[in-house]
Amino acid sequence: MRKKIVVGNWKMNKTIAEAVELSSAIIDQLGEVSASCEVGIAPAFPALSGVHGVISGTGIHLAAQNCHYEDDGAFTGEVSVRMLDEAGCSYVIVGHSERRQYFGDTNPVVNLKVKKALSAGLNVILCVGETLDEREKGITTEVVTCQVKEGLEGVADIGDIVIAYEPVWAIGTGKTASSLQAQEVHASIRATVAGLYSEPAAAGVRIQYGGSVKPSNAEELFAMPDIDGGLIGGASLNAEDFVAIVKAAEKS
């Protein structure tokens, strides 16, 4: 039985003080973290230290939203995995569609980041997903399969990787893939992992859904056999909504 995982991606939202306040509210409303579901939050880089101080010892994981593939150097504005490790991160999100769209994170760049993060002992949330144009052309499976294969190129062990399927057309738009649409892609991703590694590895890898997950649709999504939790954007900025989604995952 795969353990569900729900991670809140706060993106470029919340000041340090606001992030500390939100993480405290999540702890207060969530109570003890259930053994049936991992929980993580990914604040913006400046808030990592403050949030880590709040969630340390609660069982909630600290995640980063991105990393660079070099240890150090002249890369203005970037953050290394060693810095993230020292800040208390246990997870890092790699290949989010907004990174791919706005910052030129190609599949080969994503692959370099995946391998660098793993080398530092971080768990990776590898994001994949198709655009609306790609879905309408009927090439969702081909696009996502390519992203998975190229993102995992040269990665010998998938044990420390979570895959997040995030249809780009459903991120921040209010649109959501139906539970059956999401399940179809998740099953395809699991089959791809089986081909790259093994059936046991595929059976064990957790695949999150990300794309306008809300308290109203979380339970239905998480009931699907290949959906193992969520990478939550907008709803994670509200403690009550985020905790409701976590509770839905715990029950599924």
UniProtKB/Swiss-Prot annotation:
Quaternary assembly: Homodimer.
EC number(s) per entry: 5.3.1.1
Reported function: Involved in the gluconeogenesis. Catalyzes stereospecifically the conversion of dihydroxyacetone phosphate (DHAP) to D-glyceraldehyde-3-phosphate (G3P).
Binding locations of substrate: N9, W10, K11, G172, S212, G233, G234
Gene: tpiA
Pathway: Carbohydrate biosynthesis; gluconeogenesis; Carbohydrate degradation; glycolysis; D-glyceraldehyde 3-phosphate from glycerone phosphate: step 1/1
CDD domains for this protein: TIM
One Gene Ontology molecular-function label: triose-phosphate isomerase activity
Organism: Prosthecochloris aestuarii (strain DSM 271 / SK 413)
InterPro entries in the cross-refs: Aldolase_TIM, TIM_sf, TrioseP_Isoase_bac/euk, Triosephosphate_isomerase, Triosephosphate_isomerase_AS
Active site: H96, E166
Name recorded for this polypeptide: Triosephosphate isomerase
Biological classification of the source: Bacteria, Pseudomonadati, Chlorobiota, Chlorobiia, Chlorobiales
